[in-house]
Structure formats: C-alpha cells, structure tokens
Curated annotation (Swiss-Prot):
GO biological processes: cell division; cell wall organization; peptidoglycan biosynthetic process; regulation of cell shape
Biological or metabolic pathway of the protein: Cell wall biogenesis; peptidoglycan biosynthesis
Catalytic function, reaction form: UDP-N-acetyl-alpha-D-muramate + L-alanine + ATP = UDP-N-acetyl-alpha-D-muramoyl-L-alanine + ADP + phosphate + H(+)
Name of the gene encoding the protein in the UniProt record: murC
Positions of transmembrane segments: none
Family listed: Belongs to the MurCDEF family.
A GO molecular function held by the record: ATP binding
Protein name as annotated: UDP-N-acetylmuramate--L-alanine ligase
Alphabetized Pfam families for the sequence: Mur_ligase, Mur_ligase_C, Mur_ligase_M
Keywords: ATP-binding, Cell cycle, Cell division, Cell shape, Cell wall biogenesis/degradation, Cytoplasm, Ligase, Nucleotide-binding, Peptidoglycan synthesis
Positions contributing to ATP binding: G129, S130, H131, G132, K133, T134, T135
Cell compartments where the protein resides: Cytoplasm
Function text: Cell wall formation.
Length: 488
C-alpha cells in the first residue's frame, strides 16, 4: 500500500507518531532525522547498530533493536492517533513488523512518497544519475551551506559539513538525492532536477537500458528545470535539458569546467558560462569525475541565483561524502581507504584516481602510496552476472586484486556470478595481475596481510560490508581516531 500526499505539513499531524521499519538505512535515517527535527514523534526499528541509529537515539528517537510484531503493539499503545509506518524497497513483505502493521490496519508509506512530499513542499533540487549523485548532492549542499543558504538536506551519504546525512536548514532550498534503483524517483517533482550520467545498472529492477532511460525521462519531465551532463552520450542523445554542463568542452553548453591541472591532491580548472570564461577554481579533490560532480554543483548554485564569486570561495570547504575514497587509517605502513564503488564505471573511476595519486606523488593521504592493492566485494549476484567482464577490465587498473565473496543484498545465487568467476575473468584479461579470492571475511583479512606491502594503498571497494575491513585489521595504528561510517 502506498499513499501519495503533498504537501507534508498539510497531511501529517505532529501528534501522529511515525515509525520507520529499517530506520538505520542511509535513506531512511535521513528522513527520520528531518522529521524529528521538525517536531514529529518518530520511532524506528533496525537489527543493525550503526552511527545512524546512535544519532537518532541522541535526538530522542526510540529505536527497537529487532523487527518484530511486538514493536507495532508498543508504538500503538497510549497514543491518540495511530502511527504512520514508513518502509523502503529493502523491506520484504514477509517482514514480521510490516505484517503486523498491515494486520493493525496502519497506513503504510514508502519512503519515496515521504521524500516526494518533502521535495514538493519547498523549492528543491533533486540530484539523480547512475554515478556521482551522492557526491554531487553533498558538494551542492556544502556549497549552499558555506554561502549562507542553509539548505535542508536529505542525502544518501554522510555530508562532512554536517557530519550527517540529514539536516533541517532555515534556508528556502531543499537538496535531495534521488535514487533510481527502484524507479520511485518518478514521484519527485523538484524545482531543479540534476542528472549526473546514465548507464545500465540495477538489473534486478531494469530489464534493459531502455527501461532505465524511460524512468529517468519521467523524472526529468517532472522537474520544473533539468540540468544534465553533456559528456554522457546517453543523456545527450535522449534528453532535453534546460541547461547542460561539461568538463570536456565549453562549446554548446551552458556551464563548463576545463581542467588545467589534475593532481593527486587537487584539480585546477577554468570555469565557463555560455562560452565566457568566468575564472579559475581549485577543487580540493582529485579526479576528472569529481570535477564533473563539482561542476554540476556549481551550475546548480548559479541557476539558483548565487554569484560566481561566492561559489568560487565556497569551493575551499568541499569534501566528498563518507565512503567516497574515505581514508580510514594505517596498518603497518599500509594506508586503508574505503570506497563505495560497486559498478564497473565507478571501480574504474576510483582506480584511475588512485593511480593519479600514485603517479603524481601528491595526495591528501598522510603519505603518497607506492602501489594499489584493490580489495573488491562484488555487490549483488545480478550485477556481478551482468557486468562480470566489465568488472574484470576495470580491476585491471590495480597492481594486485583481492576478491571478497559476493555480497548478496538478499538475492539468490546465480550460477557463474561468483568471485571465483570474476577472478578467472581477470586472469584471462590481465594474465600478469596477481589475484586471490577469499572464502570469507576472516580469510580476506589474512590475504590482505599476506599480499600487501609497506607503502601500499589498500583500496576497499563495494557497497556491502567491505567497509568493515579496516576494523578487521586489529592493529590499525589510529583506529580510535577514525570513526565508523554512518553507512556502516
């Protein structure tokens, strides 16, 4: 059952409790934070303990440590209005708490409907795309914050400026990350939509690229204005945008960032608007993909009326979100970095950036690394099956590769979609590249100890629980100084 309502304040009574099943999820926790900070009575449940849950409890949110029918009985007792229950696509119909909510005839709302209401209730910017949407929405939120716009933000990652994925601002704008994985972003009707790029992913939901294109078109058509990436061939061919940006050309686009210098610690570029040079920027982040993400954020700010000078000054405070080339600490001379890359294009972009850090000898890491040990955890059998050889090609950019078992994300195994199959594909494409496969997480830690060298960059990539690898290295030199990710 799904309920469409808008605006939020005209439908939700602050005296009506709102309960999130799976509140520790990165998208759910952001919404819960927004609502509790707007005076709503919020509760939730999650079988995982993470930083998101800790933050919610600190805000006074009651979070149950399991998901059971008893939780529904508890939240329905001694209330004047029956609770509204919020779920995400990750919650199966067999969930005992969801089944109890249905038996109690509670209204059940998908998180996308709640986010859609927030987006439509005020001027908003919704950032979508196959890759870079979390980084772009984080950079945009930070630029708006540092230029005294104080936006409300609902992001799928930790925004370092707020140390949170959700923030209630006093400014007029809301920034939201629009996730395409289940198609629910078609409900969002933003003042400005942003699409970073587009290519096939989430093959558990989309049978082919055309289905994904049609979904993203519906998202774009629902926005009052659309800002899109001119460098993406699919967007360029299939979409009619209000404005375009590029990091390759200033001709025929509204905004461009043309790189002058790409180093391992920063990027210097000239900014153009309508073909006119506006000035030079220094982005404190490496990688051409990050320059594109930053250009999208800059363009969105300019479309919302901010001066170029203000935006230019705000760039100095930019940081990527958590789990995006996230330095976690050191272990016996090895530097451990965690990254969310889980699609071949993301793996390639992350390794290209890592290689730039190695070759340039310049880095924001404590020490410039000498070699790249990629530790990759495939995410979902469906994605591994579809992109097996693309993953093999992308991982070839490392100096050595360790593979964790596939993180199922609730999917059933698919024959041939295994880490062993991926290792075989890597050996075929890159015969001289050292590759090893771990049978479990404990063995993965042993393989890191065995195959890594002093001076290595140990780059853990994946969207599952690979971000726990640094914890497994029990002798991490500065573990106490590196807090766990909110998405952990």
């Amino acid at each position: 059952m799904s309920l469409w309502f808008c605006p939020l304040t005209s439908t939700l009574n602050r005296q009506q409790p709102i309960h999130f099943i799976g509140v520790g999820g990165i998208g759910m926790s952001a919404l819960a934070l927004i609502l509790v900070n707007r005076g709503h009575i919020v509760s939730g449940s999650d079988s995982r303990e993470n930083t998101a849950v800790e933050q919610l409890r600190a805000q006074g949110v009651r979070v149950f440590r399991d998901q059971s029918a008893a939780n529904i009985d508890a939240i329905c007792s001694n209330v004047d209005l029956l609770p509204l229950v919020v779920i995400s696509t990750a919650i199966p119909k067999s969930n005992p708490e969801l089944k109890a909510a249905k038996l109690s005839q509670l209204k059940i709302l998908h998180r996308s409907d709640l986010l859609a209401a927030l987006i439509q209730a005020q001027p908003s910017i919704a950032v979508a795309g196959s890759h870079g949407k979390t980084t772009t929405s984080t950079l945009l939120t930070t630029l708006l914050a540092t230029t005294d716009q104080d936006p409300t933000a609902v992001i799928g990652g930790v925004v370092p400026y707020y140390d949170s994925n959700g923030h209630v601002g006093k400014g007029r704008l809301l920034v939201a990350e629009a996730d395409e994985s289940d198609g629910s972003l078609v409900k969002f009707q933003a003042t400005l939509g942003v699409i970073t790029n587009l290519e096939l992913d989430h093959t558990d939901h989309y049978a082919n690229l055309d289905e994904l294109i049609n979904t993203m078109k519906r998202f774009g058509q629902g926005c009052r204005r659309l800002l899109a990436n001119f460098d993406c061939p699919i967007l360029k061919e299939h979409f009619d945008a209000t404005a375009w940006w590029s990091v390759k050309t200033s001709a025929g686009v509204d905004f461009a960032a043309l790189p002058i210098c790409l180093n391992g610690d920063q990027t210097i570029a000239d900014i153009y608007e309508q073909g006119k040079r506006m000035g030079q920027i220094t982005l404190p982040m490496p990688g051409l993909h990050n320059l594109s993400n930053a250009m999208a954020a800059i363009a969105a700010c300019r479309l919302e009326g901010l001066s170029f000078e203000d935006v230019q000054q705000g760039l100095a405070d930019l940081q990527p979100p958590g789990r995006r080339f996230d330095f976690r600490g050191t272990w016996e001379g090895r530097q451990i970095v965690d990254d969310y890359a889980h699609h071949p294009s993301e793996v390639s972009a992350t390794l290209t950036m890592a290689r730039l850090i190695v070759t340039s000898g310049r880095s924001q890491l404590p020490n410039p690394p000498k070699r790249i040990l990629a530790v990759f955890q495939p995410h979902r059998y469906s994605r591994t099956n579809k992109f097996l050889y693309d993953f093999a090609r992308a991982l070839g950019e490392a100096d050595a590769v360790l593979l964790a078992p596939v993180y199922s994300a609730g999917e059933n195994p698919i024959q041939g979609a295994t880490s062993e199959s991926l290792a075989k594909a890597i050996r075929i494409q890159h015969p001289n590249l050292p590759v090893a496969v771990a049978e479990n997480f404990n063995q993965l830690t042993l393989l890191v100890q065995k195959h890594s060298l002093k001076g290595d960059l140990v780059l853990a990539m994946g969207a599952g629980n690979i971000n726990n690898l640094w914890r497994q290295l029990t002798h991490l030199d500065n573990a106490k100084r590196c807090p766990p990710s909110l998405a952990a």
